[in-house]
Structure formats: structure tokens, C-alpha cells
Amino acid sequence: MAHEQELAQAFDGQAERFEQAPTQSDPAALARLVAFAALVPGSRILDAGCGPGLLAEAFLAAGHSVHGIDLSSEMVRRARERCARFGERASFEEGSLFALDLAIAPFDGAVSRFVIHHASDPLAFVCAQVARVRPAGIVIAYDHTTDPDPLAAAWHQGIERARDRTHTRNLTPGELVDVLVKAGLGDVRLAEERFELDFDEWFDRGTPVLGKDEVRRLLLGGTARGFAPSPRPDGGLTLYCCRDMARGVLPSGPSAPSS
């Protein structure tokens, strides 16, 4: 509960910068995720950790209905404002996914985007979505991933936590697949994309533990697959990153998630 409260406060404060961030708002990336989801037309979707409604808007524009939930009241306010033109097909609530009323389920699909690296327990987070999806429904997890090498991943996570006190851990691509499988999903598919972060833009919308100069210094001391810093001639710093989208299908018959 304490972690969820910290997340709510952090994202209330960074909502405006988050909504404008190129990585979050890129229309082409959002469209690719909608296509990867491959949901049947007119599906009813749960957006877990919906933020300011960027992904919800993309699914709504594709003809689906979306119910979004987020811990941050400011994110929910922005999502409602952004998606108001879609009328009753769009609904949003402030709160924890784990407390989401099962009476409004089942959904045809559930999706989370850039959320798992803030989850205290990624498996429990995905299982909470699975519990609210109908048999044969779809669950999609999309997140920034890290290096399979433990030392490189540890360096990466140290940087992330220095820049954002709410960060827990980036999963590797394999771990992301494993979480969906352990949650009881089958036919799991994975697709990976490269993306870039500008260090200053990325740092400035975080909740840092260390100062910007110190985090920059630490960044220049290492590299990892999915998090590779590269100085630019203009004095800026680009981070070359990887994001993975994993898609699983809930079996039609009874299936128990594994622990």
C-alpha cells in the first residue's frame, strides 16, 4: 500500500511532463501496440495503469471500448479529458488494480504500458488482469526491458532507481514472457522495438534520489542492452533502449496461474 501511495503522489506531480514525453505520446508506437494486440473489433479493454489516457485514446480511436484505472488522480483527470469525445465507450477510475470491482468484468482484453517496472510484484500485477479477463481473452504487457546479463542489468537498475524513487525493476524480455506464462496465459508472443530517450527530458520527469549531474556521471560509466548511453556533439546524451510487448491468451477452459 505504501508503494502505491508513493506512485500516486509521484505521478500526480509528473503528469504534465509524462503526457508530453515523446516516448509516451509517439502515435506510431501506440498504433503498433494496438495492431500487435490484434483484438477483435469492438472489444472491451481494461487499461491497467492508464496514465493520461494516451493508449486508451489509441484503442478508442480503433473502435474499442476502454475502462482505465490509475493510482494517480491527476492522470485520471487527464485521461477523462483526453478521451471525453468517445462518450460512453471511455471510462476511467482512480484506484488500485487489485481493488478493481470484479463486477465490471470480464473484459475482452487487458493491457499495461510502461507499468510493470513500477510494480512491486509483476506476476501479481498480471494475475490481477487475468482475473478480470474472459476465457480466450487477451493480455498484453508492454515495457522497457533490460539486459539478460545480471551485472549489466544491476548497473541499469541502479541508474533507474537513482532517477526515480518509484522504480522497482525492469524485466528482461524472457522474464516478461515468463510472467505471462506463470499467470496462466498461453500462445505467448513477443515483439521488440528500439527507442531513444533524451537524458535531460527523461531525468526531468522523474522523482530522483540523486542529482542530475551524478546520475549522468554514473550513466557514462557503463552500458547495457536496452540502456546504452551515447554522448551527442551538442553536449546532450541519448539513451538507446529496448521495449518489448508480450501478448498472451487466456485458455478457454479452467487454468490456474502458477506461483
Q: What is the predicted role of each segment?
A:
Residues 101-109:
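A short acidic, Gly/Pro-enriched loop at the edge of an enzyme's catalytic core
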